C-alpha cells in the first residue's frame, strides 16, 4: 500500500499522483475500512476486471475466427455447381456446429467431388479447390513442396495450386493462376484483387484450425483481374 502511511483512518477519499498524466487524482475510499482493506478492495476489483477483459478478448478472437470460417463457407457456396459440392459444404457446417446433426452421429460424407482443373497457356496444370475440405486436400496431400500456391490476400477464397513438374513457371502462368485465385474468392466482384503466391512448402497448416485455414509468410504478390481465360480440363 504505497500511500497507506498518509491515511489515519475514516477518510472518504485520498489524493495521489497519476503517473500517466502527472496530475493529482482523487480516489474514493470506504471510510469503514482501513487503508489496507481499501487497497485490497481495489486490488480485488482490478483482478475481476482483468479476468473479464481476458475472457472478452478470448471471446472476440473466437467470434472473429467463426466469422472468417462462415465467410469462407459462403464463398464455397458461390462456387458450388453440383449436389456433391453442396453435400461437402453441409458436412462442414454440421461438423463445426453451425447446423444441427440429423440421423446417426459421427457419420461423415465421403469427399468425392474434384477440384477445378485448368491448363495454362504454357501447359502447366492448375487446380482450384471448391471448398475448405478440397483446399486442405489440394495443399497438403496433392501438391508437392515446389509447386506454387496462390490465394487472394486477406479474404476468403480457393487455394490454387500450379503443378511445376520441376519447371520454372512463366509470367503468363503466374498471371493466369492469379486471375483464377481472384475469381474464386470473395473479391470476384472487384475490378482487381491482390493475390499472394508462394511455394507450397512454405504454407503451414494451423493445428486445430478449421479446414482450409493456413499460415504463410511471403513477399510475393500480384494484382489480378478476377476472370477465367482458360478452358477447364474435364474428366
Identify what each model region corresponds to.
Residues 1-235:
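Extended, highly charged segments
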